[in-house]
Regions:
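Metallo-beta-lactamase
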Residues: 34-42, 67-72, 76-152
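Active-site HxH/HxHxD metal-binding segment of metal-dependent hydrolases
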Residues: 1-61, 145-148
Length: 152
């Protein structure tokens, strides 16, 4: 969903164990490899070795059509990873139950967050949302109850 250390820290180990591919929105390429931007320099720098596949919009993987909807703000490449056929969204740190992701980090932007919130409000259909932290929620619940979505 994005390139911050708490979302990519185990990638090298997972790739070594499972020989899997790693996909990331193209706008977070620098975030993945730069310890200042992915924030790992605040704890233990990651020094990522995995080769990633950059994505702009859609991929097909294991029979799933997966949309990477770029919703910048938390990072430039933050995305909803959407499994449309199953009405599931992995939201990373874009949106949480009752909140949105921080926008005060390097590579973050309040202006982009506001634009992304407007995009989220325009998504039709109800989806089950699995955020990067905290409990799951639904898109309908967030449209009704999330104060950040309702302020704009």
């Amino acid at each position: 969903t994005h390139g911050h250390f708490d979302h990519i820290g185990a990638v090298d180990d997972l790739v070594n164990k499972y020989q899997c591919s790693v996909y990331l929105h193209e706008r977070d390429y620098n975030c993945f490899y730069d310890d200042d931007i992915n924030l790992s320099n605040y704890s233990k720098p990651l020094n990522m070795q995995t080769k990633i596949t950059l994505v702009k919009d859609f991929i097909e993987c294991a029979g799933f059509k997966i949309q990477f909807l770029n919703l910048p703000g938390h990072t430039h490449g933050s995305c909803f990873v959407i499994f449309q056929d199953h009405h599931i969204i992995f939201s990373g740190d874009v949106i949480f139950k009752g909140a949105v992701g921080r926008y005060d980090f390097p590579n973050s932007s309040l202006e982009e967050t506001i634009t992304s919130i407007e995009k989220i409000k325009g998504i039709s259909g109800n989806y089950l949302i699995y955020p990067g932290h905290g409990p799951s929620t639904t898109l309908d619940d967030e449209k009704r109850n999330n104060p950040y979505l309702n302020r704009l």
